[in-house]
Amino acid sequence: FLKIAEVGAGGNKLTLSMSVAVEFRDYLGDFIEHYAQLGPSQPPDLAQAQDEPRYYMDLKENQRGPGLGSTQGQTIALPAQGLIEFRLIDDYGVEEEPAELPEGTSLTVDNKRFFFDVGSNKVSEVKPTYRFGHTFCK
């Protein structure tokens, strides 16, 4: 079992910068190497729980540059034979020097208000019905 993140209601999409994606890949590196050393196995039939989160990873690029998108679904799915693909981040990832951070700010779009707390690496979304925040570790 490999737990990546725990996300609450309404916060099902997360985009990482390429430098954070490199660090994420590094954490998976030990697991990738361990899996590569394992021989073929015949796991027993296990009942799958329906309430576990699933994350889909997507390497994409937009006007701000390349990024690694992560979308939460219902059950976690990291196929072991596909973990080696995370090493592609070596081709696209960059090492960044720590930058001087700007002050936090907020932005209103339609009926949502987003608060950006740069010092704690947090983005909060406020709607009339609920407030939700993401904290990104570096």
UniProtKB/Swiss-Prot annotation:
**Localized where?**
Nucleus
GO molecular function terms noted in the UniProt entry: DNA binding; DNA-binding transcription factor activity; DNA-binding transcription factor binding; DNA-binding transcription repressor activity, RNA polymerase II-specific; double-stranded DNA binding; double-stranded telomeric DNA binding; mRNA regulatory element binding translation repressor activity; purine-rich negative regulatory element binding
* Gene3D superfamilies tied to this protein: 3.30.2450.30
Where would you say this protein principally sits, based on its record?
Answer: nucleus
- Where in this chain does the entry annotate a coiled-coil region? none
Q: Which InterPro entries does the protein's record reference?
A: PUR-bd_fam (IPR006628)
The GO cellular component terms are:
cytoplasm; dendrite; glutamatergic synapse; neuronal cell body; nucleus; postsynapse; postsynaptic density
Q: Which keywords does this Swiss-Prot/TrEMBL entry list? A: Activator, DNA-binding, Nucleus, Phosphoprotein, Transcription, Transcription regulation
Check the UniProt entry and state the signal peptide residues, or none. Answer: none
Sorted alphabetically, the Gene Ontology BP terms of this entry are: cell population proliferation; dendritic transport of messenger ribonucleoprotein complex; epithelial cell proliferation; lymphocyte proliferation; negative regulation of DNA-templated transcription; negative regulation of transcription by RNA polymerase II; nervous system development; positive regulation of cell population proliferation
* Entry keyword annotation includes DNA-binding: yes
The PTM Phosphoserine maps to: S70
Q: Which PANTHER family does UniProt cross-reference here?
A: PUR-TRANSCRIPTIONAL ACTIVATOR, TRANSCRIPTIONAL ACTIVATOR PROTEIN PUR-ALPHA
* Subunit text: Homodimer, heterodimer with PURB and heterotrimer with PURB and YBX1/Y-box protein 1. Interacts with FMR1; this interaction occurs in association with polyribosome.
Write out the similarity annotation: Belongs to the PUR DNA-binding protein family.
Its job: This is a probable transcription activator that specifically binds the purine-rich single strand of the PUR element located upstream of the c-Myc gene. May play a role in the initiation of DNA replication and in recombination.
Q: What is this protein called?
A: Transcriptional activator protein Pur-alpha
Query: What organism is recorded for this protein?
Result: Rattus norvegicus
Q: What lineage, starting at the top, does this entry show?
A: Eukaryota, Metazoa, Chordata, Craniata, Vertebrata
